[in-house]
Amino acid sequence: ELAKVSLWLESYAEGLPLTFLDHRLIRGDSLTGPFFEDLLTFPVSGEPIDDLFAQQINERLRKTLGEALAHVNDLEASVGKDVADLEQKHTAKKRLDEALSPFRMLAAVWSGCVMLGDRGSDLAYRNLVTTVADQENIDIHKSLQPALQQMSDLGGQNLAYDLVFPEVFRLEGSPERNAGFDSILGNPPWDRIEIDPKQFFGNFDFRVIEAPNDSIRKELIAKLEANVTIASRWSEICGMIDGEERIHDRLFSHQSIAVAGKKTLGRPDTYRLFVERWYQLAKDDCGYTGWIVPSSFHSNEGAAGVRKLYLDNTNLVCCYSFENLKRLFDIDSRQKFAVAVAKKSALGTSSLRAAFYLLNPEWLFAEDKEDRQLVIVRKDLHRLSGAHEAFVEARSNMDLSLIVAQSNSKATDWGDWLVELGISTAFGVELHRNPAFAHVLSESVDTAARFQICQEEGWHRLPLHAGKTISQYTDMFSSVPENFVSTREAFSTRHWKRSVQGYRLAFRMKAASTNERTMIAAMLTPGFVCEQTLAVETDPMKRPNMNALITLGFANSYPFDWQVRQRVTTSLSNYILAAIPIPNIQQTSTFIFHSTLRLTCNHEGYSFLWNEQ
């Protein structure tokens, strides 16, 4: 209704009635609506409906669409110059809805059935398809099939675009989609498709949010779940989320892709679903899409699928990334967002215009953009970022040229380098999920003193390092280890039993390109475990310590750090680091190793390493 009022205020002409907009402004769920070809598959099994039914339903659709498009023509016959004209439009809209009603009902039932999963019924859906194909009365049939009502209610909010806008997608009444929108604009939600138990149950008891650890939180939640009303609501919400995930998995195929044999990580963000939906809705070879999305579209591993979709199947015209320091959006000032435009094209993207770390939206309308605008060549993306093809965030064309030159002259990259040297890393422990690792140390002493204490005690407990306890080449920084875990508890989880006995390379996970240094790495002594703010080696006994020391020295170097800064947003990961180029350092490896050893061995915990090397 607000959209109508806004358009009426813009388009009002004195002496004419308000424009008829009922067939233009549609309310519905853009992410759960199927296309007509989806309706010819069984919602539960996913198998195609046999040819006989498919042929009947296609013939029925062709006939109905011909009628529907005639009603659309009636709707567009005039601008609505008087009350009689508007009445004619209302009548034409009613006839259009009646003509397409069977197929919209079919779409609602199909979506609902997919969302129900194993509780859905392919048989009930098949019976409904038969009814539609035979032009029987659907309302009567629905009353005979109670399961259909549940499916219809669940999927009733979906927006089946080609059945709502037949004049856009099915020219000349064709049952096949042969067109689409000329242009699509959007600023989609940026939320994750999940619900946080802490937030939900915190609405009923604020102590759930304030709980000091996961164990206490689980106890509080268990008490709340004893309330039938709360438990029922929680079950309903979880079922709704599960249903949405099922239909998204069915309708979208580029949310997660295989890269080097591994699926890209991350639960789908809502914006990624919209980005893929817009591609589906745009007209082949000439439809434009334009949107504002988080900068993760061009940088994150989880967005690799939709990023590749657009690079392969559209001409990605531009991608301009902004910092939110001026609070253009009511989000964290550190979060970045991107304005992107693409034109659907079978030729894909050969190059695109890009800019990063922009602040003022006025820059978009400047005549001269050469001070910040880059031209990123598609063939360079794989070389710079690997198969994920993330965009490097260079600030100038000179920076971009240097990044490309370093990549062209590399001997290997970080990912292959680690494999060659036998180094593997993983995140540390999330304390809120692992309360056994969150015991508080009573004494506040530095790492060197902590090593001595634990050695004297026989290492029956293991202290935790965090990002704030290390800096480059040192495990003693501004903060001291604050937590510990019993050795028995630590050895029963993950890699700690085999890894904690060795000297291990570790680096901070939280890092930004605006920090004094972005890559912060150190060698940890035996006996210490790590929380999630550090990535740490998992199998140090499989490689000589010299390999880790050389890697540490190179990781803390200025050239490597500069490359990291062109890629990082707010945190590091193996995904971001993997494609960073490594030059041939064979002639300098001894110097790097020797210098790193001297910078690292700063207390008794490194005595064995010093003597060994």
What name fits each language-model region?
Residues 2, 6, 16, 20-39, ...:
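S-adenosyl-L-methionine
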